[in-house]
């Protein structure tokens, strides 16, 4: 909410209007002016399914792609793949493996690259104010020097 208010990012929230409103109210956040997408009523779902079937050819059929797209990790990854979003944040909802797997399957790595990495930022309130820690490669590349 603060990052949106400060113009740092423009979020897209995934879920039903009721789910999003309840989560925002519970957290004390405003979702006014923030784009929301309900995967159950997404007007480009057929294009998304077709592209996902093509990307996963031989590994997932149309029915399994539709089922996967009911999960926000796959739906959000496809938004990135289709150029509708710039990135996906999902580590609070899904494990690292369940967040990275759709990206590796659908977006893939740069040609010639076999190593992926990750990072996350932790905030902690202390006597001195807010402390911020950037953690890199904690869950994916356990020994980045190799």
Task: Name each model-derived stretch.
Residues 1-146:
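Anion-binding alpha/beta catalytic cores of soluble intermediary-metabolism enzymes, centered on
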């Amino acid at each position: 909410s603060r990052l949106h208010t400060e113009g740092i990012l423009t979020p897209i929230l995934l879920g039903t209007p009721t789910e999003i409103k309840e989560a925002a109210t519970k957290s004390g956040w405003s979702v006014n002016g923030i784009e929301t997408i309900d995967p159950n009523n997404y007007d480009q779902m057929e294009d998304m399914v077709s592209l996902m079937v093509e990307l996963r050819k031989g590994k997932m059929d149309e029915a399994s792609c539709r089922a996967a797209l009911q999960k926000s990790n796959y739906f959000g990854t496809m938004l990135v793949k289709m150029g509708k979003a710039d990135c996906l944040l999902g580590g609070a909802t899904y494990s690292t493996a369940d967040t990275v797997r759709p990206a590796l399957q659908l977006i893939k790595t740069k040609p010639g690259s076999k190593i992926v990495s990750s990072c996350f930022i932790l905030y902690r309130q202390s006597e001195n104010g807010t402390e911020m820690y950037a953690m890199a490669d904690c869950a994916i590349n356990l020994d980045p020097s190799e």
